[in-house]
């Protein structure tokens, strides 16, 4: 309290530089996955990112891609985010130091937060979370500065700067509004008690807040100019702007659209477990010490700030647990949710730093003249921070991670000239958009997002940037026709002039006819080239032999990262091949072809399934079912080059493996009944050999 501001600022800068050095050493050199591809592309094209638009991040990323002289556009934005994360660490240090005067406490707060797995992972990727961490640190630092201010003039200046920063922070991630909702009443009440809150000052604070929101003018400006080859939404009207700003397409107060999530209690338990895992139990204990310390008379002067921070933490945790409508028992959804716990983790880290300073202060008062206590304080802080770095450096080191980049490049490079690619899903969509638009790869190819075609703004905004693609209506709809408002909608059948339906393995079919040659590369992506006739052999060869799906890629992905599906993340190449195998198998089931071609298709699918399943012991459970069905079909072909006993044995084995792990499959009893008959058939085959 009242510590030297200059010394604290210098120490904060030095600590930020150290964090920046470690972050830079572990940056991914290319596209990291998740939303990064879409955010970078929107910035590069000066378009609008997904709701709520993230105008501040978009503009900063555009500056980074244009001004930084190193690496690819993705690397430059990754570097920007790393530097923002380092700045957030400096602000956390400054907050603790300003309130307690403890260097060790500040280092503890900044270090344990910055080098936790979750913070590190999302601070070196081109995502909005490091900028949000920066604003969390900034608002807490300004709060501490306001509390320590000694004059009315200084408090007035800080409150105006804080109002501006509150508005500016909302130009990035809206979850910070819960912290603003705590800080603003607290600041106003402090000003009111000191008789420093006049109507004129309140008006000035409001104007400063509105000035912070000015980056949102970028959204209608970008939408009006409509020069970006990738953008989201139509913000040229006030209603369109509000739709985007309020995230109405996702659900304004929900994390996702049309999802049923875990219970509030389950969410809070997961969050507490995550805090313990990410920050360690001693850090949580120190945060609790800070809260308990408010009962000590010697700490009364900073008690209001500690209670404010604790209130921010509680409000955010409770509200987020209430509205985060995702099932966090699924690894991918847990990965989506846990990123939003970063905001609460920053507060816990600051409280822990204050708790360490409190213990040192109380210890000094009890053991007057002891020289061991300062050393013990420093040793505790450095030990906890070092343990974070030691535990997480290897897992967070993405300096050799080219997985998503190679995935996108191999896929695009293997496409035929002039292809039109229908995209579904974040991984293919974001990755292909980035390498195509930002790095200029394969300018002859056209990317069309199948899911985005369902939005009424997609064609009016982007059709002119898709030359050579004819859209027979205003937007895509499962049932074609004219809507009551006069909108002409078309379905995929009309768009492709073929009937096509692709769903998850075991649930769908794909069919084709003359006029368009359709190649299924993997489930969420289809490539179309204009040719006459349906060339089955080319589909088989292209779908399985292309480098896009068969070249081995280095695995550095976590099941909780949004660059793959739960459990599939380390298996991107083989998962793509599995989907192609499913396509070939399903074609054999449904296509009107002669017996010889049908036999070739079943054989090709069986061979592919066998190779993929045997090469990956830890694969998704549905692979067992798909492979077992393929074996059963091969058995019915009565081919002389395949041992029927081996086929039945494999069918039984993999059906049983599937039913052990997929207890919720409604067909489970039917599968077990089929296994009984197959076992009898296996016994008969073995008797025939005797």
Regions found by a protein language model. Give the residues of each.
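ER/secretory pathway lumenal C-terminal domains and tails of membrane proteins involved
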Residues: 125-126, 133, 146-162, 166-420, ...
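Alpha-helical transmembrane segments
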Residues: 9-23, 208-211, 311-316
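Transmembrane-helix signature of polytopic, membrane-embedded enzymes
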Residues: 6, 10, 17, 92-115, ...
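Transmembrane-helix motifs of polytopic, lipid-linked glycan transferases
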Residues: 13, 79-100, 138-142, 353-354
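Short hydrophobic/aromatic helix or loop-helix immediately within or flanking a transmembrane segment
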Residues: 42-71, 82-83, 90
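Extracytoplasmic catalytic/substrate-binding loops of multi-pass membrane glycan-assembly enzymes
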Residues: 27-39, 49-61, 229-234, 399-403
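Aromatic- and kink-enriched transmembrane "portal" helix at the membrane-lumen/periplasm boundary
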Residues: 24-25, 46, 67-78, 85-88, ...
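N-terminal membrane topogenic signal
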Residues: 1-15, 301-304
């Amino acid at each position: 309290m009242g510590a030297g501001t200059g010394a604290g600022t210098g120490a904060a800068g030095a600590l930020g530089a150290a964090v920046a050095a470690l972050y830079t050493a572990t940056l991914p050199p290319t596209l990291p996955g998740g939303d990064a591809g879409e955010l970078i592309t929107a910035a590069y094209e000066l378009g609008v990112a997904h709701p709520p638009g993230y105008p501040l991040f978009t503009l900063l990323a555009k500056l980074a891609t244009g001004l930084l002289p190193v690496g690819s556009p993705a690397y430059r934005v990754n570097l920007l985010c790393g530097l923002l994360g380092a700045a957030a660490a400096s602000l956390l240090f400054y907050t603790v130091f300003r309130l307690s005067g403890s260097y060790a406490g500040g280092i503890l707060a900044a270090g344990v937060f910055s080098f936790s797995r979750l913070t590190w992972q999302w601070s070196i990727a081109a995502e909005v979370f490091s900028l949000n961490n920066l604003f969390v640190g900034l608002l807490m630092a300004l709060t501490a500065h306001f509390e320590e201010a000694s004059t009315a003039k200084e408090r007035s200046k800080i409150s105006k700067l804080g109002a501006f920063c509150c508005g500016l922070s909302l130009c990035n991630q809206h979850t910070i509004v819960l912290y603003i909702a705590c800080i603003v009443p607290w600041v106003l009440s402090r000003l009111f008690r000191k008789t420093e809150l006049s109507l004129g000052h309140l008006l000035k604070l409001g104007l400063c807040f509105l000035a912070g929101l000015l980056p949102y003018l970028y959204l209608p400006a970008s939408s009006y100019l409509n020069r970006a080859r990738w953008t989201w939404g139509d913000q040229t009207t006030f209603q369109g702007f509000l739709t985007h700003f309020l995230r109405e397409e996702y659900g304004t107060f929900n994390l996702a659209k049309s999802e049923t999530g875990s219970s509030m209690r389950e969410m809070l338990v997961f969050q507490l477990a995550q805090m313990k895992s990410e920050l360690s139990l001693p850090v949580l204990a120190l945060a609790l010490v800070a809260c308990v310390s408010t009962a000590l008379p010697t700490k009364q002067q900073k008690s209001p700030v500690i209670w404010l921070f604790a209130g921010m933490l509680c409000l955010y945790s409770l509200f987020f647990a209430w509205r985060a409508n995702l099932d966090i028992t699924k690894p991918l959804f847990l990965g989506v949710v846990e990123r939003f716990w970063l905001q609460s983790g920053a507060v816990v880290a600051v409280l822990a730093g204050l708790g360490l300073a409190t213990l040192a202060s109380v210890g000094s008062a009890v053991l007057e003249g002891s020289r061991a206590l300062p050393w013990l304080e420093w040793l505790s802080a450095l030990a906890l921070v070092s343990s974070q770095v030691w535990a997480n450096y290897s897992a967070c080191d993405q300096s050799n991670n080219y997985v998503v980049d190679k995935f996108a490049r191999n896929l695009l490079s293997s496409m035929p000239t002039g292809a039109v690619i229908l995209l579904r899903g974040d991984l293919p969509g974001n990755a292909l958009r980035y390498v195509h638009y930002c790095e200029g790869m394969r300018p002859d190819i056209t990317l069309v997002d199948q899911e985005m075609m369902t939005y009424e703004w997609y064609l009016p905004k982007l059709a002119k940037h898709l030359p050579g693609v004819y859209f027979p209506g205003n937007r895509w709809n499962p049932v074609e026709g004219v809507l009551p408002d006069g909108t002409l909608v078309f379905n995929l059948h009309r768009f492709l002039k073929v009937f096509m339906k692709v769903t998850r393995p075991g649930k769908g079919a794909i069919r084709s006819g003359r006029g368009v040659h359709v190649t299924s590369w993997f489930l969420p992506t289809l490539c179309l080239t204009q040719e006459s006739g349906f060339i089955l052999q080319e589909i088989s060869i292209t779908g399985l032999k292309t480098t896009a799906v068969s070249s081995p890629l280095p695995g550095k992905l976590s099941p909780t990262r949004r660059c793959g599906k739960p459990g599939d993340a380390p298996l991107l190449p083989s998962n793509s091949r599995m989907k192609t195998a499913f396509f070939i198998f399903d074609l054999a089931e449904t296509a009107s072809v002669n017996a010889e071609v049908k036999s070739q298709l079943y054989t090709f699918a069986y061979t592919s399934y066998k190779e993929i399943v045997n090469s990956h012991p830890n694969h998704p459970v549905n692979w067992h079912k798909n492979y077992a069905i393929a074996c059963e079909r091969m058995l019915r072909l009565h081919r002389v080059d395949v041992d029927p006993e081996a086929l039945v044995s494999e069918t039984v084995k993999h059906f049983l493996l599937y039913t052990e792990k997929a207890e919720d499959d409604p067909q489970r009893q039917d599968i077990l009944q089929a296994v009984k008959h197959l076992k009898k058939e296996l016994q008969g085959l073995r008797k025939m050999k005797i």
